[in-house]
Amino acid sequence: MAVPVPLGTEDRTSRLTLRRPDRWRREDAPQADLRLTGDDAVLTVRSRPSERTIAEEHTSLLERLPGSVDGLRLIGCDPWTTAGAPARLVEYVRPDEEGDVAGAHLLFVTGRHRVDLTIERPLARMLATDDLVSAVLESVRATEPAPSRPQRELETLPVAVPVPQLDGTHLGADALLTLRSLAGRRWDPMLLRSPAGRELVQTGLVGRLGTLPEPTQELIAPWADDTQPVTLEQRLPDGRTTRLQAWSETVVDGTDETGGTVARLPVERVVALAAGRLGIRPSWTFPFRTGALDADLLARRTGDAGTAPDLPAAVAEADPRLARFWAAPWTVSSIRRPGRPTPVVVVHAEGIGFARTGRTEAGETAFRSDSPANVYRSLVRALLG
């Protein structure tokens, strides 16, 4: 449950009012209606004349944002109902020289104006500031009359961006195992005679005389203490399985049986890579009427794609939203964290959205829809938490 956040000061512009913590400070910003800073967050309000609907303005925003900053990723969008005007909340993450930045963009229209309120803070502080940011956003109220035209249907959202690929060195299973064995040890010249050792030399990870270049030493350093990785395992709709493991900044994309690609990345790039694998992008999130399903039924649906059972007819008839989700191709992802025996299990239904499995009690497993932004937060918690 979110902790109540005290908001003591009210700020007002010609288009809105909001409440914020007393410790936040107003700053001069000639190009903005309002600029506030505090708790590592920067809040900016801008407005301009517009007679377009919220659907038109939201579609325009989703089309424009990814091109505004190279590498910006949209992680979610939702209708917003507390502003007193038609509104949408868009969440995104963008690269920055000092570290990735998480943004919340509240957009609303009054029929005469479009108002944009953004709150940005470091991605590393995203989870710590979520309650505060949410409280400020929920305090926002439009001061102009809302348009009389109701928005009856939600607008179409953009298609998914291409899944990013890991740019690194591909190694066979034996070579990868040999590389891991070098962490914290001296190079054994005898390994030069093995196929795995020769592969490491050919890829440049090991020198021809058995030396370990500095980049290789940095790459294998997390393995010296037998540190356990954060692991993202996925079962794809065609039945294939993939695995992405991250030891801080050392990443392996592959399995023990087939080998994989190894690379060293800033941990924020690892988050971006995993978000792409999960298929995180803006999608509308609607709750299922059904809160739990037969545990065996759900276990078979999240298991081998070739044995996926049908949803019982009575459940499908009572919950059409769940029936559509169940019928779509699934990617089942497990996020495993060191020291946590139970993984976070997330289901992505192609073209629809996300759901999450929960506890099993009395033969039934909790199963609820989830927003892409919340799934993204699970990644942040696992990799940066």
Segments the model singles out, each with a brief description of its role:
Residues 2-68, 78, 99:
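Secretory pathway targeting signatures of secreted, lumenal, and periplasmic proteins
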Residues 22-24, 117-152, 370-385:
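Surface-exposed amphipathic alpha-helical segments
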Residues 30-31, 99-105, 240-241, 339-342:
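Short, surface-exposed coil-to-beta transition loops
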Residues 60-110, 134:
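Signature of long, low-cysteine stretches enriched in small and polar/charged residues
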Residues 88-96, 231-235, 333-336:
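Short beta-strand segments that buttress and anchor functional surface loops
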Residues 146-201, 205-211, 215-217:
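Short, amphipathic alpha-helical interface elements at domain boundaries
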Residues 169, 193, 203, 207-276:
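Accessory beta->alpha helical hairpin/"wing" motif in late/C-terminal subdomains of nucleic-acid enzymes
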Residues 174, 178, 271, 277-385:
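Long, compositionally biased intrinsically disordered terminal regions
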